[in-house]
Each structure stands twice: as C-alpha cells, then as structure tokens.
Amino acid sequence: FFFLIIVNHLVAQIPIPVAGKIDRIENFKSKFVTARNIDIWLPEGYTKNKKYAVLYMQDGQGLYDANITWNHQSWEVDDVLTSLVNKNSIKEAIVVGIWNGQTSRHVEYFPQKPYDCLTPIEKDTVTAQLQRASRTKDFFQPKSDKYLQFLVKELKPFIDSAYSTHPNKANTFVAGSSMGGLISMYAICEYPNVFGGAICMSTHWPGT
C-alpha cells in the first residue's frame, strides 16, 4: 500500500525538462480508450509565430525526467532534441508524450489486424504466453485499432488546434520502444497518410 502511494505520487508530478517547457493535459478524455495524461514538450523559445513538426511518443511517463519515473530512468527526449536542434541536425519539434494505459498497455500496443489473422490455436498460444508473463488474466484481445483511432481522430486534431504545428504528413511522426515500437510501426502501416515516419526502437517483435 505504501509503495502504491509513492508510485502514484511520483507519476502525478509534472516532469522538469532540461530545456523548453512541458504542458500537461490531465486525464485526456477519449471515446476509444481510457482517459490518460498527455505530457507535451515545447522546445525552448516556442512561439505561435512559427510552425513546428510533431513527434507522438508512446509510454509518455518516461520521456523527460528520470527523477520522477518508477525506475529512475528516462529517454531524456528534451535534452536530446535540444542538442540535435542546436547542431542543426533536425528541425524543431513538439513532442507529445502519450501515457500508456498501464494495465491496458499490452492490449493497446499489440497490432490488432495481424492478431485477428491468427488461427484459434495460435490465439490461445498468445493468451497462454501473456498469462504466464502476468500481462493478461483473461483471453487476450488487442484493442490497438481503437488506440490508433484515439491518436489520429482525437489527440492529433487537439494538438493541431491548440499548438502551432505543421499538421501535414511530412511533419508528423510517431515513436516508441519495445511494445511502443511495435504500435508505432502499426501506426504508420495503418495511417500512412497521417504519419511521415516512425521510430521503432528495440521493437518487441513477438508481442508476448
């Protein structure tokens, strides 16, 4: 119980970036997935007078500040992007950190259409493997199509209306690692007219 209090306190804190600023949208509502926090990183000197590319990143809890993550590790996205921009290696971008659904992470990140093509025996095997890994208690059924609908039909339009973005494909990217890499790959396959690129690091190819 005490551990849960500590964890809840940590994840509730807003990350402190090395550069730029972070806007948090608390419990962003969706008709497709459960409500979740969205941590939006704005680069140093962000202004409404110019347009920015947007990078949508999975597992948004761990992107910016290692001091408040459960394992005291982070991607240090704000630090890395600021360094790359200063070297003129990339253009400035807004980062949208999408918190995972915690207990629903595997359900939301597992590519749905490939799973639906499996035989009943293969689906039983996937369920058994996930149950052994304590990633599901019931028969496994992905909901990644709904997750991507949330991303494309609800979150992206909100970001494009609330911030100064280039909304076109050439300036819209998605990224993640492990299962986050898998859903990012699925995102660009399902919505090639929305995303111009995907970063799929250490992709969890088996999905179990």
Model-derived regions: residue spans:
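Bacterial Sec-dependent N-terminal signal peptides
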Residues: 1-16
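Non-catalytic cap/lid and distal C-terminal segments of serine-dependent acyl enzymes
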Residues: 13-208
